[in-house]
Amino acid sequence: MPFAIGQRWLSESENALGLGVITALDQRTVTIYFPAADETRIYAIAQAPLSRIVFSKGETLSHQAGWQGEILDVQNMNGLLFYLVKNPQDEDVIVQERDISPIISFSQAKDRLFSAQIDRSTHFALRYRTLCHQQAQFKSPLRGLRGTRAGLIPHQLHIAAEVGNRVNPRVLLADEVGLGKTIEAGMILQNQLFAEKVQRVLIIVPETLQHQWLVEMLRRFNLHFALFDEERCNDFDLDAVNPFTTESLIICSLNWLETHPNRVEQALDAQFDCLIVDEAHHLVWSETSPSAAYLFVEQLARIIPSVLLLTATPEQLGQESHFARLRLLDPERFFDYQTFVKEQEHYQPVVNAVESLLANKALSAVEKNHISDLLLEQDVEPLFKAIASNNDEEQQRARQELIQALIDRHGTGRMLFRNTRQGVKGFPHRVYHQITLSEENDKIDWLIDFLKLHRDEKIFVICQTAATAIQLEQILREREAIRAAVFHEKMSIIERDRAAAYFADLENGAQVLLSSSIGSEGRNFQFAANLVLFDLPTNPDLLEQCIGRLDRIGQKRDVQIYMPCAKDSPQSRLARWYNEGLNAFEQTCPMGMALFSQFADELEKVRSNSTALSENEFSGLLKQTKTAREKLKIELEKGRDRLLELNSHGGEQAQALADQIADEDNSPELVNFALKLFDIIGVEQEDLGANSIVISPTGTMLVPDFPGLKEEGVTVTFDRELALAREEMEFLTWDHPMIRQGIDLVASGDIGKAAMALLVNKQLPAGTLLIELIYVVESQSPKGLQLNRFLPPTPIRLLLDNKGNNMGEQVAFETLHSKLKPLGKNIANQMVKMARSNIESLITRGDQLVKSLAEPIIAEAKNQADQQLSAEINRLQALRAVNKNIRQSEIDILEQQRTQSLDELSKANWRLDCLRVIVTNKE
């Protein structure tokens, strides 16, 4: 059928888009706008998966104005249809097809049944189960959290759930080194992408970390990002195309944007939804002279709705630098540094009160006054009385309620997440070994002996410079044939990736990785547990960064730190200062840089000449440092923001979330569904044992391509621990693209839409007709509203006997399906022809019955949406009165969403998705 502008067509692959209208046409493509979903699609005319929608005389037509009427006549004029319709006022009116409502139900299952396109009964069962699983997954609170290839770390899951559920989140992720900020950012992003809150994402990272982010996003989250650099962008300049509009998920380097201002302008014009900046502490800012990098990130942050900044801890940054990050997130709120400092001081009494609540101590009168001042709108006297009561359960409830109220009103608690090792338990120990040598030149011999003694271990070696690392590699290779990889800042990103992969290879890889102290930034090697400091890093932060390559989440063993140096050498004395003064080898030392600056003059003498200080003078320096460290530690502990820590690690709720995902990991439900899906589609399966299988395409599959299935096959596992150990395997969860798109493949395709089966039952007369009808209640609405969380496509099952009685509740689906036998296609077609009028009558009866079942589902969805969105709006409005970090724009968006959501849910409808005709026989 020829295309014409104004015609109405249906997408066969995306029924949920509703009825589309042709808006543009050329020799090769047709453009269709789908008003119900506010989406546009462009199709190749030769292969367009479209169905022309033509209504017949006697059918009911829905007008876009909201009324319905019976079609009296149909006329075709130049390819466009005009319907003569009787409207509700009993008037005959002409309706052009462009005025037909875009929200429309299609009984394609019936059409397939009567046109001899009858599927097997097992295909119908797969379709119904798929619809049920689809509904369950849209409603699941674990959606977007469980699919990450990572361990179930409670604080990471808490942050991902808390931030991921927000509208346009703008937050600072400032966990200590090794606690997984990259994973947190990826989980937040995945959550937002799943909810369709964001679609276009820009990630800006240091040049050395580009490939690592690219690999992490793909390996852990199945997100395919594009890497942008000048060479790639130059290809688009000839066509005058903004390169940033050619991809939705983009990674680029900070240095590249800094040196190419024209690319910043293009990024500003590309309308991204989400900005992620790693190592944001490198953005230098002061009130008088902010850096160029800070300024262009500020420009991007002003126009991109969602912003995630990954940065060092506030203790490491210093207050001014910390303020600069917060200023990027909310310049209206953080407009003046001195005001910010005063506000931070104001929270100290509240922190003290929280300490008392956590320690189950009685609240002092001063603490009660501070709590009352902060919670002005809440009557806290009953809670104070409960805390003073003798009822332990009542006491704990009141303490938790007060703590939660204080967290909600915390100064930066909504914008800042900072977990510390002190707050996150379960890390292995660090064990420091100082190796005293006769001479500095003995280090190479010691290293060779050490490597020979630990042949089966992976060893990470830190050198001061790239030259030292290169020289060491040559010596190890030539003298002992020790396989070593080199890693330093002068290598290209690809060379560093290859070196890291060579070191990570457990079978044929390098035993040792020789890295410059700067070159290792951002790289993680927690599969190794031995660190050799061939040269000592020049400051405490650099030392912590080097140790943090191994000592991080995922490390299973104690980290052994070896420091070989000559007795009384400058390196030896500096190592003693790190160890005895800072205790920086065996514990993290957030005050390290402050002490390094405080004793800079003395340390400079030690580093330049080991005898510049006498032993007594050096011992005095160690004592002074230790005393200053203890004093700073006490001050830090006093200023330790327990409210922020509670908000960041999530406590019992975070653990409960991890436990829920672990329970789902152990459930056989996904495995059973996936294997049945692969089997019916025609995907070949080879069991490898040990919780893994190889799946491969075949020439007899029901579909041309199965999502994510390569021609050579894919090894998959449903086991999280195995997936973490074997990166070459795909980790299948309900969130994996192969499963999600497999569900979409079935739900949006024709598999199982019309089926027929035989029921052997001696109690029923032979030839008794039953019909199973599966309707789907859904809302055809814009994606951004995320109405699937309230009303996902919801299947309603009817089982009608030949008198039109619904037995769906009395006869369970699986019980009935297990008793059915297949029918040959020819016999099935003959039976359908013979029973057509009865089948049509039963379908009409089903259409009448489903209304009473669908309307309560829609009403409940509206009620849920109203309650949930209203509760969040009311909560934010109450908090905004006492916490300036709540943005009015966030409340405005939620109010707009509530109005639009309720309006769209009122338009929700239902359609017949699939049916199964069942004929009985005695045998």
Swiss-Prot record:
Gene Ontology molecular function: ATP binding; DNA binding; helicase activity; hydrolase activity, acting on acid anhydrides
Enzyme type, top EC level: hydrolase
Pfam families: Helicase_C, RapA_C, SNF2-rel_dom, Tudor_1_RapA, Tudor_RapA
Key words of the record: Activator, ATP-binding, DNA-binding, Helicase, Hydrolase, Nucleotide-binding, Transcription, Transcription regulation
Name listed for the protein in its UniProt record: RNA polymerase-associated protein RapA
SUPFAM superfamilies associated with the record: P-loop containing nucleoside triphosphate hydrolases
Family per record: Belongs to the SNF2/RAD54 helicase family. RapA subfamily.
Lineage: Bacteria, Pseudomonadati, Pseudomonadota, Gammaproteobacteria, Pasteurellales
Primary gene name: rapA
Domain Helicase C-terminal: 443-597
PANTHER family: DNA ANNEALING HELICASE AND ENDONUCLEASE ZRANB3 FAMILY MEMBER, SWI_SNF-RELATED MATRIX-ASSOCIATED ACTIN-DEPENDENT REGULATOR OF CHROMATIN SUBFAMILY A-LIKE PROTEIN 1
Residues of the Helicase ATP-binding domain: 162-332
CDD domains, per database record: DEXDc_RapA, SF2_C_SNF
UniProt-listed Enzyme Commission number(s): 3.6.4.-
Complex formation: Interacts with the RNAP. Has a higher affinity for the core RNAP than for the holoenzyme. Its ATPase activity is stimulated by binding to RNAP.
PROSITE patterns: HELICASE_ATP_BIND_1, HELICASE_CTER
Motif (DEAH box): 278-281
One annotated GO biological process: regulation of DNA-templated transcription
Function text: Transcription regulator that activates transcription by stimulating RNA polymerase (RNAP) recycling in case of stress conditions such as supercoiled DNA or high salt concentrations. Probably acts by releasing the RNAP, when it is trapped or immobilized on tightly supercoiled DNA. Does not activate transcription on linear DNA. Probably not involved in DNA repair.
Binding locations of ATP: D175, E176, V177, G178, L179, G180, K181, T182
